[in-house]
């Protein structure tokens, strides 16, 4: 079931306007266990393979330590939906890396924006964006102009 999206587990509606299905929690997990396990395995493999490439490229000094992902969230952004500028870690939720898997590209707008709009990676269906969750990487999802944007997100601890 689709629920209103949140930021860092806080319901702050003025910051995020989209809908979410928590793929790794509670009733969604129990109701669709067999299918969910298959999806989880595929997502885990996609993210792990790309994470290894990311760490090989950006972690030559070994500063980034990773242990696990936080589970997966399916996000749906309809026309007009957005996420305002925020970071993905907080004092009570340590996250090292953020991951966003783009599921479609048949929409307009909805870009992930860094550095107050100076950096907007052009993402296509199947792309996985990995970036630090820390205060040095505030980001936002710009409003969807038309269509519906779908993505799956997780965080690496």
What are these regions (language model features)?
Residues 1-64:
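Non-heme Fe(II)/2-oxoglutarate
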Residues 59, 86-87, 137-139:
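Eukaryotic intrinsically disordered and solvent-exposed regulatory patches
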Residues 72-74, 99-101, 152-154:
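A structural signal for short, well-ordered beta-strand segments
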Residues 74-91:
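Conserved short histidine dyad/triad with adjacent acidic residue
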Residues 88-105:
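Short beta-strand/loop turn elements enriched in aromatics
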């Amino acid at each position: 079931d689709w629920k209103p999206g949140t930021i860092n587990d806080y319901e702050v509606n003025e910051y995020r306007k989209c809908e979410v299905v928590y793929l790794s929690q509670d009733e969604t997990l129990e109701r669709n266990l067999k299918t969910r396990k298959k999806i989880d395995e595929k997502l885990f493999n996609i993210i792990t393979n790309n994470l290894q490439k990311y760490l090989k490229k950006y972690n030559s000094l070994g500063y980034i330590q990773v242990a696990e992902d936080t589970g997966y969230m399916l996000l749906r952004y309809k026309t007009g939906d957005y996420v305002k500028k925020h970071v993905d870690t907080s004092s009570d939720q340590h996250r090292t890396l953020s991951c966003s898997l783009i599921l479609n590209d048949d929409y307009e707008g909805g870009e992930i924006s860094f550095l107050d709009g100076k950096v907007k990676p052009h993402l296509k269906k199947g792309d996985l964006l990995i970036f630090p969750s820390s205060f040095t990487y505030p980001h936002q999802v710009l409003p969807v102009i038309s269509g519906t944007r779908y993505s799956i997100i997780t965080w690496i601890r």
